[in-house]
Amino acid sequence: RASWPADFGMVADFWHRNNCTVLYAEQRGQNNSDGEYMGFGLTERFDCLDWVKYMNSRFGTALPVWLCGVSMGATTVLMTAGLDLPENGHGIIADCGFTSPGAIWKHVAEKNLHISYGLRSAVADAMCRRKILMGADDYSTVDALRAAKVPVMFIHGTDDRFVPISMTYENYLACASPRELLVVPGADHGMSYYLEKEKYEEQVLDFWHKYS
């Protein structure tokens, strides 16, 4: 299970150096957050929209809001792109997100675990429908991005052994809003910032300045 100190410990310094007001969130079913089950972005996208509304209730709507996430967090913020964000929602930064629960389960089963996903697919989907009332492929980042209205920056490492970079390419091509892509040669899953810190920061800052 992920936690924000583990996932954002390094990049947090970059955000604070650039005077960002940051809400660090642990998704449902993670550590101290409520909820028994992860929705792999399907349910968390609605939580994400609630977090934006919470920030606006605390700080007003004058500040631009950027949604950022890594891995399942990236999938969550990308799926949120399909919802009606407040007017101060300025953009999304998604680092190595997958396209849907079903797609990543299939990839991990076949490519990482080397097991057939055929029957397991039906079992996994049935459990998903029972626990979160949605099927594993009922919604995807591709669906969301076709309706995206805010700019999106996609980030992925070429050597990602968990989420294939092809999923980010698929997301990028589906995105209907202004989009940018940072590909980091040699970076494994979630390691792009650590491997190309200066390039990562430079491109994120440029993205912020362009769309703030």
Predicted regions span which residues?
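Catalytic active-site module of serine/aspartate enzymes centered on a nucleophile-bearing elbow/loop
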Residues: 195-212
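Short alpha-helix in the alpha/beta-hydrolase fold that links the catalytic acid
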Residues: 150, 164-173
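Acidic catalytic loop of the alpha/beta-hydrolase fold
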Residues: 158-163, 190-191
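Hydrolase active-site cap/lid region
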Residues: 79-134
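Short beta-strand/loop motif that positions the catalytic acidic residue
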Residues: 147-149, 154-156, 160
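Catalytic histidine neighborhood in serine/cysteine hydrolases
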Residues: 172-190, 203
